[in-house]
């Protein structure tokens, strides 16, 4: 990895850190998911970054990947356990970071501490040549030692330019893999601790999409969506709200359904 690449990764990381710090200032009981999301997006843009992926505000039993809808009227409530997951990119070089907070209470401090300690232990383990299974084992050991369970089917991942989930997945448990980290790799480590069974299931609907490959479509709106995503997001994730903001056309919902594989 050359110095210019490292510089851009670091800049993306600094932007994300400032956005995280800003989010902690504005998230309060009664605040709107949508307005908070828009404010964080504006912050990232003001720092000369762009979005690595839609900002995730995942509350309580929603483990990950919830992003505000077009007319989302959800508000934060006292006692909510909120996972804020965001990232920035500079010329396609990505950052991906997250934290967990409670709204107005502190009843889950041991759970959040378990994930924090697992992250620190994993970072201390990382070096060229280390097996990803060893990283997973460290995460698993720390989380279980605190009385919680790692989520097995959520994981960290390798980062490459314009590719958020590139190549390797970094497990949250010992998956016995012989695969090793190589010098020059960029990775996101994502420990998930739960007081549940340690397995998530997909929701029926999603607001987050990714262009896998262009496909022939008859709908003019669908063609506009393809053109916008290919030009502005390449292979990076995007959300329906961004499509609605940027593709001024009727039938966004129907056209999005036509594009799903």
Where do the PLM segments sit?
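Active-site neighborhoods and metal-handling regions in enzymes and metal-associated proteins
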Residues: 1-261
